[in-house]
């Protein structure tokens, strides 16, 4: 069977069988319930079915159906865009309710970040073994005061421990992309900060994105711009939390971001409460 890879779906198929086996081995899928994004021609999928308890795969390209025929009842393939799916509904329909899932995928380069954020915000996914553009992988692992350190670095490291499995040269794919790739394994933290409420996690993500809004600007300027607050109020917050007014987001560690984000939203709530009280007093 012939299939012409579609550029609009970012289709680059890994040719190296030994590397495919290594990816599945490192993913440690024995007896687990697994999600695969983009099974493609099924090379990786076939190996997964030999290890997994159940496999739910999402394929956006229906022309790949002839390649995705397996002699097992352990797999279900949904021909749809993973990003548009109600994952909770899909998971409840196929797996047991409140199950823990492992995810595996060769991510399309052009939507890697979008998929990562969906994975991050899906609590059922406890680990993910991912092939991605090397540049994006370096950002995920980046540390403070490095050029690759950004909001994605902080947010991903907040939720997951990141292990680098292997770099993959571009010639190992068909068609050959212009850039190299890397395989990473993301394992959800079991530490205290990851037991925060959903609202606390959303606040953290909101704060980190705001802090890196314009990387070359100071934290003070970014917070003022995003939250529409006068700098005098933010300087007061900085003084209360012993922050330098010229500090930039790229200088702040993950643990510091955790502490600052909590204090920031407490500060905002107090500010709003104070403004409301002043308004009421003026009306009396």
From Swiss-Prot:
Binding site for S-adenosyl-L-methionine: 12, 14, 38, 59, 81, 106
GO molecular function: 16S rRNA (adenine(1518)-N(6)/adenine(1519)-N(6))-dimethyltransferase activity; RNA binding
Protein family according to the UniProt entry: Belongs to the class I-like SAM-binding methyltransferase superfamily. rRNA adenine N(6)-methyltransferase family. RsmA subfamily.
NCBIfam families, A to Z: ksgA (TIGR00755)
Organism the protein comes from: Phytoplasma australiense
Disulfide bonds: none
Record-level GO cellular component terms: cytoplasm
Protein name per Swiss-Prot or TrEMBL: Ribosomal RNA small subunit methyltransferase A
Protein location: Cytoplasm
Catalytic activity: adenosine(1518)/adenosine(1519) in 16S rRNA + 4 S-adenosyl-L-methionine = N(6)-dimethyladenosine(1518)/N(6)-dimethyladenosine(1519) in 16S rRNA + 4 S-adenosyl-L-homocysteine + 4 H(+)
EC number annotated for this UniProt entry: 2.1.1.182
Function text: Specifically dimethylates two adjacent adenosines (A1518 and A1519) in the loop of a conserved hairpin near the 3'-end of 16S rRNA in the 30S particle. May play a critical role in biogenesis of 30S subunits.
Sorted UniProt keywords: Cytoplasm, Methyltransferase, RNA-binding, rRNA processing, S-adenosyl-L-methionine, Transferase
InterPro entries xref list: KsgA/Erm (IPR001737), rRNA_Ade_diMease-like_C (IPR023165), rRNA_Ade_Mease_Trfase_CS (IPR020596), rRNA_Ade_methylase_Trfase_N (IPR020598), rRNA_adenine_dimethylase (IPR011530), SAM-dependent_MTases_sf (IPR029063)
């Amino acid at each position: 069977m012939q299939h012409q890879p579609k550029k609009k779906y970012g289709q680059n198929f890994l040719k190296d069988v030994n590397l495919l086996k290594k990816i599945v081995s490192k993913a440690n899928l024995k007896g687990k319930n697994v999600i695969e994004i983009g099974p493609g021609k099924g090379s990786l999928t076939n190996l997964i079915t030999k290890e997994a308890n159940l496999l739910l795969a999402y394929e956006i390209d229906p022309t790949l159906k002839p390649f995705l025929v397996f002699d097992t009842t352990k797999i279900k393939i949904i021909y749809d865009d993973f990003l548009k799916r109600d994952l909770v509904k899909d998971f409840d329909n196929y797996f047991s309710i409140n199950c823990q899932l492992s995810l595996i995928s060769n991510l399309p380069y052009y939507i890697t970040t979008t998929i990562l954020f969906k994975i991050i915000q899906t609590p059922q996914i406890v680990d993910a073994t991912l092939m991605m553009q090397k540049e994006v992988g370096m950002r995920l692992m980046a540390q403070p005061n490095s050029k690759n350190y950004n909001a994605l670095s902080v947010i991903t490291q907040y939720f997951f421990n990141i292990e680098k499995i292997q770099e993959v040269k571009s010639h190992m794919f068909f068609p050959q992309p212009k850039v190299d790739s890397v395989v990473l394994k993301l394992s959800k933290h079991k530490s205290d900060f990851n037991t925060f409420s959903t609202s606390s996690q959303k606040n953290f993500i909101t704060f980190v994105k705001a802090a890196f809004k314009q990387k070359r600007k100071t934290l003070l300027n970014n917070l003022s711009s995003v939250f529409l607050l006068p700098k005098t109020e933010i300087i007061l917050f900085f003084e209360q939390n012993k922050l330098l007014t010229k500090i930039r987001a790229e200088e702040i560690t993950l643990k510091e971001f955790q502490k600052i984000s909590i204090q920031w939203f407490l500060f905002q709530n107090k500010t709003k409460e104070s403004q409301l009280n002043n308004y009421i007093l003026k009306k009396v």
